[in-house]
Curated annotation (Swiss-Prot):
It comes from Drosophila melanogaster. The keyword Transmembrane helix applies. The gene is Or71a. The atypical heteromeric and topological design of the odorant receptors appears to be an insect-specific solution for odor recognition, making the OR/Orco complex an attractive target for the development of highly selective insect repellents to disrupt olfactory-mediated host-seeking behaviors of insect disease vectors. Odor-evoked OR currents are independent of known G-protein-coupled second messenger pathways. GO terms for cellular component: dendrite membrane; plasma membrane. Keywords: Cell membrane, Membrane, Olfaction, Receptor, Sensory transduction, Transducer, Transmembrane, Transmembrane helix. The chain crosses the membrane at residues 38-58, 67-87, 128-148, 167-187, 256-276, 281-301, 344-364. GO terms for biological process: detection of chemical stimulus involved in sensory perception of smell; monoatomic cation transmembrane transport; signal transduction. It is found in: Cell membrane. Odorant receptor which mediates acceptance or avoidance behavior, depending on its substrates. The odorant receptor repertoire encodes a large collection of odor stimuli that vary widely in identity, intensity, and duration. May form a complex with Orco to form odorant-sensing units, providing sensitive and prolonged odorant signaling and calcium permeability. The keyword Oxidoreductase does not apply. InterPro entries: 7tm6_olfct_rcpt. Coiled coil: none annotated. This is Putative odorant receptor 71a. Belongs to the insect chemoreceptor superfamily. Heteromeric odorant receptor channel (TC 1.A.69) family. Or2a subfamily.
Amino acid sequence: MDYDRIRPVRFLTGVLKWWRLWPRKESVSTPDWTNWQAYALHVPFTFLFVLLLWLEAIKSRDIQHTADVLLICLTTTALGGKVINIWKYAHVAQGILSEWSTWDLFELRSKQEVDMWRFEHRRFNRVFMFYCLCSAGVIPFIVIQPLFDIPNRLPFWMWTPFDWQQPVLFWYAFIYQATTIPIACACNVTMDAVNWYLMLHLSLCLRMLGQRLSKLQHDDKDLREKFLELIHLHQRLKQQALSIEIFISKSTFTQILVSSLIICFTIYSMQMSPVLQDLPGFAAMMQYLVAMIMQVMLPTIYGNAVIDSANMLTDSMYNSDWPDMNCRMRRLVLMFMVYLNRPVTLKAGGFFHIGLPLFTKTMNQAYSLLALLLNMNQ
């Protein structure tokens, strides 16, 4: 049926192309390491900003100051890892999206399937908009407030080769941060959303496969051909799951590693700062905290959806009209159901299964680190 199967991600890849993080050609089989425009954009902003933040964190001698620096330093470090990852593996994701949008194997063939896609796309768009508001909403509080502070103060602490507290030199550092922060935010939000959409679409394809399996009838014309086509669809989805894991594994693993520290340092900074004396700063930190929690929660939700959709395939096959099929077909059904017992899961870094248990572990680790910091402060 006539429906754009990958509608939400087209906007996201368009944004990534603008920031030189996505192949500009439609069919690319290898990473393009000669993209000098990408280097010219991200080296002076993304990677230099990360370096300056780490230098400030290393030179710090105070726990609270170190926490204030690390909460943004770790975020930008994860961003740098995501940028390198997408430069290396964007062609893999581009190939998968091309298959989903053009191959007849993934064509939507009923109103029920179109409605399912349309509903999930609308919900994904709402989630993405809320995530954008939480992430981008921090920028005005962070960037505008320092303009009214006396003495001068940068949005984030970072090392500079000059004394930025001098009135004239302050503006060089401030303009650099005011330019870098929106760029980092836009790239980070968009790359996260592409990862989430790949997992969402994979779970939708598995649900579509389950619906088609449950509708198989013993008196269907070309029953064997339909069933073999569904087996081929399942095999292709498993291959795509491996490719998606290659694309999202390292970036998700990096995000999981730093998320517990970021959440910990954010809450610690909020507790150590006087709320009534700095309401805009407190509001910014609250939004930042929500965005960081969403950054680790949403991939686990979409990863869990892949696991659940794959696990439901056996039940869907069992709910078909297999008892009335001939012996040869029942034998094929039995072999396929045994094959379905192999789980379809996505891993982060080859270690962690991307699912809701990973989110709870990350939050528990953040709480433990926060308790340790508070005890050290006492």
